[in-house]
Structure formats: structure tokens, C-alpha cells
């Protein structure tokens, strides 16, 4: 029998009695966001909406985005990345478990000096893939042109965010490149590796 989303007590300022809310609702109130699934339209819109809402509520307090994602669709991932650059608060990105494909792209998009990986996290980068291998030739050619533009966009962002030269990023994106937290730090995708009991939550 599925447990469902756990609920925790929450007391609003000025209220005596606590109400039970789902744990993610409670964490969102502390400006903690989660990308814990494949990147697709619905979760992308939720994260973007939360970032915008929390920025309107208080544009001086940092946001924290925890990532454990196998990747997913390119456009929803780019939407999250663009929103992170757009909102006034700094967005910390924290990799726990795996940040692969668009997950690593979002991870790299955090505020520089505020991108972190847990010690046993894994990061993977590669080029965007087509979903139209069995499409008619004309559609495939159009798709290939769009993929090339997306690859150029993703490559330029990695160059900007990691400080690596274009040729290094381009070469790495030719295949699946898996990295440990230490390797991701050396590659410029994250800035810090979490050490037990030394990281302060908001």
C-alpha cells in the first residue's frame, strides 16, 4: 500500500494551532525546491512557478534547488535554467544522487560559487538526443536542424558556467560522460562538495 506524500505540522505566524500540510508544501515555505524526477513540462512549470512566487514574496532570500534527476526533455530544462537566471534571488543548486543530462544542465545553472554536490553524487553530461528516429525523412531533417541549435545553446551555457574552453565541452558532449562529485567540481559544474555537518540550511 503506497504511503503517499508525508504530512508535517505547520503553524503560520500569529496562529496558535498548527495545521498538517504535505512535506513539500512545508519545505517550499522555507524556499527549498526539489527536482526529483525526469525533467518534463509539468515539473518544469511547477519549479518555475515556485521560483517566481517566492521571488515576489521576498526577493532578498536565496532559493535552494535540490536535484536528483536522470534528465529528460531539453526545452523544459532550459525553461528552469532561464528562470533561475531571471529571478532576483540567488539560486543554490544541490546535487544528491544523480544529475544527468538536463539535470546536470540545471545543476550548472545555479549561482556560481553556490553550486554543491553531495560526496557520493554522480553527474553526467551529453548532447541532446532526437525522439524522431522513425519519423519521415523530411521531419527528421527539420528535427536535426533544431537539435543542432539546441546543442549549440547547451554547449555555450556549459562553456559560460564552467569556464572550460569550447573544444573541451564539445568533446565531452559527444558521449555520455559520468563524473564523481570531485570530477564535477574540477570540471566547473559544481563549486563545492558537501562535507558532513558543515553546510548551513536557510
UniProtKB/Swiss-Prot annotation:
One of its GO terms (biological process) is protein quality control for misfolded or incompletely synthesized proteins. GO terms for molecular function: ATP-dependent peptidase activity; ATPase binding; serine-type endopeptidase activity. The active site is at 101 (nucleophile), 126. One of its GO terms (cellular component) is chloroplast stroma. It is found in: Plastid, Chloroplast stroma. It comes from the Eukaryota. It catalyses: Hydrolysis of proteins to small peptides in the presence of ATP and magnesium. alpha-casein is the usual test substrate. In the absence of ATP, only oligopeptides shorter than five residues are hydrolyzed (such as succinyl-Leu-Tyr-|-NHMec, and Leu-Tyr-Leu-|-Tyr-Trp, in which cleavage of the -Tyr-|-Leu- and -Tyr-|-Trp bonds also occurs). Gene3D superfamilies: 2-enoyl-CoA Hydratase, Chain A, domain 1. InterPro entries: ClpP, ClpP/crotonase-like_dom_sf, ClpP/TepA, ClpP_His_AS, ClpP_Ser_AS. SUPFAM superfamilies: ClpP/crotonase (SSF52096). Pfam families: CLP_protease. Coiled coil: none annotated. Its EC number is 3.4.21.92. Belongs to the peptidase S14 family. Cleaves peptides in various proteins in a process that requires ATP hydrolysis. Has a chymotrypsin-like activity. Plays a major role in the degradation of misfolded proteins. Component of the chloroplastic Clp protease core complex. This is ATP-dependent Clp protease proteolytic subunit. The lineage of its organism: Eukaryota, Viridiplantae, Streptophyta, Embryophyta, Tracheophyta. The gene is clpP.
Amino acid at each position: 500500500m503506497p504511503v503517499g506524500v508525508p504530512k508535517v505540522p505547520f503553524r503560520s505566524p500569529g496562529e496558535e494551532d498548527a495545521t498538517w500540510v504535505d512535506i513539500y508544501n512545508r519545505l517550499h515555505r522555507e524556499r527549498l525546491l526539489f527536482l526529483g524526477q525526469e525533467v518534463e513540462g509539468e515539473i518544469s512549470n511547477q519549479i518555475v512557478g515556485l521560483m517566481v512566487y517566492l521571488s515576489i514574496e521576498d526577493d532578498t532570500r536565496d532559493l535552494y534547488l535540490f536535484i536528483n534527476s536522470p534528465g529528460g526533455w531539453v526545452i523544459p530544462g532550459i525553461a528552469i535554467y532561464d528562470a533561475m537566471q531571471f529571478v532576483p534571488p540567488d539560486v543554490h543548486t544541490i546535487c544528491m544522487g544523480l544529475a544527468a543530462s538536463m539535470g546536470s544542465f540545471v545543476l550548472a545553472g545555479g549561482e556560481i560559487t553556490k553550486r554543491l554536490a553531495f560526496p557520493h553524487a554522480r553527474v553526467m553530461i551529453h548532447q541532446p538526443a532526437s525522439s524522431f528516429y522513425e519519423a519521415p525523412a523530411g521531419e527528421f531533417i527539420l528535427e536535426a536542424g533544431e537539435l543542432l541549435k539546441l546543442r549549440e545553446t547547451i554547449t555555450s551555457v556549459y562553456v559560460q558556467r564552467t569556464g572550460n574552453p569550447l573544444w573541451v565541452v564539445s568533446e565531452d558532449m559527444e558521449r555520455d560522460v559520468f563524473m564523481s562529485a570531485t570530477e564535477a567540481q574540477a570540471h566547473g559544474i559544481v563549486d563545492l562538495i558537501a562535507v558532513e555537518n558543515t553546510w548551513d540550511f536557510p
